[in-house]
Amino acid sequence: MDKIGQLIESGFFGGIVIAATFSGAAVFLYLIYRLIKFLQPKEVRQEEQRILSHRFYKVSGRGRVSYLILCLEEALLFYGQDFSAWERILRELWSVTSRSEGDWIGTWLDSVGELLSDRILTTAPPFSDDIREIRDLYTRFGTKMILVNALMENAYTMVCEWSPDTVAHNPDSLHFIDEAEEMMEKWGVPLPADEAVWFLLTQKDFSLGKPFDGLRLSHLSKES
């Protein structure tokens, strides 16, 4: 019994030593991490903090691009546009939230790419009545098309940069959102309503995220 007691006692103290060793290693690694962070330039630390505190940092890719589409709709609403004239364009844009089969990203990029103003306005002659109508729509919109085109381009480019190996909460696309808000402010266009934005902020995912019905956030659904 004495030997058993000694074995138990030695095992107990051995466990304490091992635990202390691992605990010490963890503390050491944490201190190294803090030292590296401290030695980073102030600008780098500030940029990291800005990214981590960005309200869309943990929002999925679908949620982020949806916000840009909402900004686009706010611009159309601000300038008194007839949403039925923009319906095809908006439906194609919003389909990014619900597509999920096959090469859905490539399909979306192809369909939306054909609707970008640089493609529409340089196609001569328009190869279909639909494209001709969209071309006339863009032309009539005049200089205000600068803002609309920039928002569409931001949404398109954001999706272009998506990939299956996107890292957790990839911060690269956040600058598209920041640019969109800056442009909206410069043009005097209000940002999207809080209710719709709150819904998007619940779409949290480290990558592209699960499909959802984004069209219900659109003014198209409110006018139907």
What spans do the regions from the language model cover?
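Short, strongly hydrophobic alpha-helical membrane anchors
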Residues: 1-13
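Compositionally biased, low-complexity segments enriched in small residues
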Residues: 4, 17-19, 150
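Structured binding/interaction patches within domain cores
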Residues: 50, 57-192, 196-198
